[in-house]
Design a protein with these regions (language model features):
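Conserved strand-to-loop "acid loop" that flanks and positions the catalytic carboxylate
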Residues: 1, 21-22, 67-68
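Short alpha-helix in the alpha/beta-hydrolase fold that links the catalytic acid
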Residues: 1-8, 80
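Catalytic histidine neighborhood in serine/cysteine hydrolases
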Residues: 10-27
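Surface beta-strand/loop "capping" patches
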Residues: 31-34, 38-79, 94-111
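Beta-strand-rich binding/interaction modules
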Residues: 73-82, 86, 117-120
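Short, aromatic- and glycine-rich surface loops/edge beta-strands on solvent-exposed regions
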Residues: 113-126
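Short beta-strand elements
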Residues: 126-138
Length: 138
């Protein structure tokens, strides 16, 4: 999708993605997430950086590797087969998985019905979120 192309214009060492299904759209709402400040303070100040996703692999399950110096709190795999709705109205489903904090991995089963697009969101103990770029089995 075009969103992915835009994300990849940012150099890898600065690229942080935070996808929020159901987030309202607008100038005020766009600056509402605390992740924006967290990223900015870690990039140019002395703030603690968000979780860093280091690898995504997809075979018989989905596996995301990450590194962080702060306690990873939760992770979910969001997916959709909805290709007709615009982003504001797209229907997303979630799948839980296994978050291995010591190894820095999250593993989730693939949905039985398949999926067209998906992403994983990881949250740290501060509830700061970071997402993978869009994942597609194609």
């Amino acid at each position: 999708p075009q969103y992915q192309k835009s994300c990849r214009l940012i150099p890898q060492h600065f690229r942080e993605v935070c996808i929020r299904p159901g987030m309202r759209h607008g100038h005020y709402e766009g600056w509402e997430p605390a992740e924006i400040r967290c990223f900015f303070e870690s990039a140019v100040g002395d703030g603690y950086p968000p979780i860093r996703i280091t690898d995504v692999s997809l075979d018989d399950s989905l596996r995301v590797s990450f590194r962080t110096g702060i306690f990873p709190y939760s992770a979910e795999f969001y997916y959709t087969n909805d290709t007709l709705s615009d982003n504001a109205h797209r229907v997303w489903h979630t799948v839980g998985g296994t978050l291995n904090r010591e190894k820095g991995t999250f593993t989730a089963p693939l949905p039985q019905e398949g999926f067209r697009f998906g992403f994983v969101t990881l949250k740290d103990v501060r509830l700061m979120s970071v997402s993978t770029e869009f994942i597609s089995p194609e």
